[in-house]
Each structure stands twice: as structure tokens, then as C-alpha cells.
């Protein structure tokens, strides 16, 4: 009886013995991730194409920045979402190489699929990939050229290489020095990192990209309030940043006040004047002469009567400061936000040599220059100009990438040749080391090495070159000791890209290979997909 029960029950355990399901899940995950990788492959390099994206709101984005494209793509498959996340991680870590990391991940997944078809266990593949990635980072450091932050020319060349694949590439002679100067100004010499939040990018429609400028200090897009005849320039400014309203108080509940005669009306107006005059006198008493007022969604941040009093007291007023600007302004000017008039004291004010409103390329901006307080972090503002919003948005993304490249060089002061040279060199080293290994690991190293060649292959394809001829030529050159041989778009073939000033930080390439191998490891270790209730 017992035997017959076991015999009957045994087919129900077939699910647990189904060996094909994990393989199908892995293939599905690899296919989805590679589809995303192939979608942005044409965007790589100086001859890469742009993508036009229409968002849910109907907004149009034109970009060839990998992180931006993937962020706005409607990616639904969870494994494909991992590729979006790895591109975002590269954007945070290095700022550049976001397209490369997605393409590398797709290529490594293709290599992993070949190994899985040979019957090699996924854990063994992922662990060997991890070791190969660690060795790749070592090879990249060995072939890199150490630089000093005093060598401004090298920094500018690296920033120019980053901009070469963007719409703004023809303006790189202006934007590259601008990116380098801004990072060096906000850099803390004690720490090997740069907080890019200290560099503020401001977009102004009007003019051309050539009119983009770097301002030492703070730039506000809000205009000075001139309706009451207040000043538009203040020297030796004492700046206050307030988060309360300069208008008569209103009750919390909705109610009506009924006025029966003119004496009551007169009394209300007198009290309103006295209330506002008292606040304005307190502001003047603290020696404040520039007032920044936070934007209010409930009621007017400042009314006409208060503006009249402030102009008579010779105080410059700038209203509608956005909530997300408060932290930057506090950091940049040394002023502390004031939420109540009773806390309005001189020690909460910031100081600057001059605050003035100027007209530039048909639009008005406010400059706060010469902030000299000891506890204030140095900040700079980059005013981007462009014919329309699409150009401005892409200019902002391009400058951000250039800033990140310079930040990478502050973290790791080493440059390598671009144009696929590092990937070919790493591939050559791993291929030669694979021959010394035994067993399955040899196959894995060889596949990893071949997968890295996707970068030079894609660069050649996007430049309209014969990828097989170019990559074969590069392999021969690297075998003969030419470590800096890469694809030169100018020469339409292989050449020494380091001598041609096609440079990139070593951190960009090492980070891309490490993150790509980690993403592949995560995908390979998934053998089932379960849906939660």
C-alpha cells in the first residue's frame, strides 16, 4: 500500500527535478538584457547616433548619453531593468562610459550564453568572470599614464574626448577648459573627491552655446523686483534668505471679515502698514541690504506695500527662490535660512562683495560675486546658453559628463588611451593568461577576453569602417607592444590614440568592466522568476 502511494506521488515532484526550467529562465533573462544593450549600441563613440525619446508627458528628448536613453526607455523585463541600473551606477561612479557599460554587459552575457550551452555551471562562469574583471582592472592601471592636477592641458584633453561624441563636440574648445576650471575651483585638496553639487548649471534659452560662461560665485535666474524702485546693484552686500512671507497674516481657517464703516477699514489698513513696517525695520536693523525670499504656494511671498517699504530702506529684493535652491544658496553665500522674523539676526546673514542684475544675451540674471566668508565652501555657476530647450538639455548633460571625467582624474590621477585601446590590451593579456590556466576556467577567460572586443568593434562599425579589418590590425599592433593603439576616427583606422590626445580616465574603463561583470554575475545566478501576490 505504502509503495503504491509513493509511486503515485512521485510524478508530482517532477517540478523540482525539472532541469530545463532554470536554463529557460536564464536564456530569457539574457535575451531581454541583450535586447536593451543592442538598442543603444549605435550611440557609442564620436560617430554614434542620437536617439529621440518621447516621454509620458509628451516631452521630447534627443540624446546619445547611455544613462539618459536607458532611464527614459520603457523597459519592463526585470533582467533588462538591471542593465538600466548598471548604467545608472556607472553614471554615479564615473559619470562617463554609461553606453560602454551597457554594451559590455550585453557582450559578456552573450559570452556566458555560449559557455552555458557547453554545459558549464553558471556559478563557475560568474566567479571566473569576477576574477577576470579584477585582473582587467590591474592591467588597466599598469598601462595607464600618471598625471598631475597641475597639468591642465591633459585634463582639458580628457574632457574634450568625453565631449567628442556629443552634439556640442564642435564647442569642446570652449566647454572643456570651462569644465576643468570649475572642478579645480571647488576641489578640496585634502580629500580626493569633488562634490559636483558645488557646481551649479543654469540653463538660459537665447544666444548660442559659444556664449556659455563660468561665473565665480552664484547666479540666480530670478530677477530683482523693481516695481517699487528698489536698487539693482548692491556693494558690500549682507544677504538674508527668508522662508516666511512679507504680507499680512491670514487666519488658518477660511472666514470672512465684514467691515461696516470706513473707520474700521482705515484701522485695518493702518494695522497692516504698522505690521509690515515693523518687519521691514527689523530687517534693516540687522544691516541686511539684499533679501532673498522663498517661493510660497499658499499666498504672495511679498506684497506691494512691503516692497515699497523695502525700497525706501534701500534693500534689494529677489523673490520666488525655489525650495531646492535653498541648500545651495546657504552653502554658497554663508547665510542661514530664517523661518521667523524673531530669528532675524546679523549672525544669520551671508556676505558678498557685490550683488547685481545684469543683462546677458537678451535675458537678465543676478550675479552674487566675491563671497569671502571663512566657513563658506567655494562654489561656481555655469550659465549654459542655447537656441532652444533641446540643445540646452543636451549641453547640460554633456557638461555634466565632462565635469565627471575631471572628477575621475581627481580621484585616480591616471589617463589611458581611448578608442578601444584599453579593451584590446586587456583582451590580449587575458587571452595569453588563459593559455596558462587549466580546465573550464581557460574557456571562461577566453570568452571574457573576446567579449571585451565589442567596444572597438562597435566604434569601428559606427564610424563606417570594416570592423574585422580594424580589430585584426589592432590585435597585431598590441601583440607587437603598441599598447596605445586604438581606433582613430580622424585617420579612419588604427593609430596611436594617446598621441592623438584621445584620452580617458582609467577609472571610467575599470569601473565599466567591474560593474558589467557584477551585473552578469547577478543575472546568471537567477534560475527562477516568482511573482508576489
Swiss-Prot record:
Keyword terms, alphabetized: ATP-binding, Chaperone, Cytoplasm, Nucleotide-binding
Region (Disordered): 1-25
InterPro entries recorded: Chap_CCT_delta (IPR012717), Chaperone_TCP-1 (IPR017998), Chaperonin_TCP-1_CS (IPR002194), Cpn60/GroEL/TCP-1 (IPR002423), GroEL-like_apical_dom_sf (IPR027409), GROEL-like_equatorial_sf (IPR027413), TCP-1-like_intermed_sf (IPR027410), TCP-1_chaperonin (IPR053374)
Top-level lineage group: Eukaryota
Localization, UniProt: Cytoplasm
Quaternary structure annotation from Swiss-Prot or TrEMBL: Heterooligomeric complex of about 850 to 900 kDa that forms two stacked rings, 12 to 16 nm in diameter.
Name of the protein in its database record: T-complex protein 1 subunit delta
Biased composition (Basic and acidic residues): 16-25
Cross-referenced NCBIfam families: chap_CCT_delta, thermosome_alpha, thermosome_beta
Highest classification ranks of the organism: Eukaryota, Fungi, Dikarya, Ascomycota, Saccharomycotina
Organism from which the protein derives: Debaryomyces hansenii (strain ATCC 36239 / CBS 767 / BCRC 21394 / JCM 1990 / NBRC 0083 / IGC 2968) (Yeast)
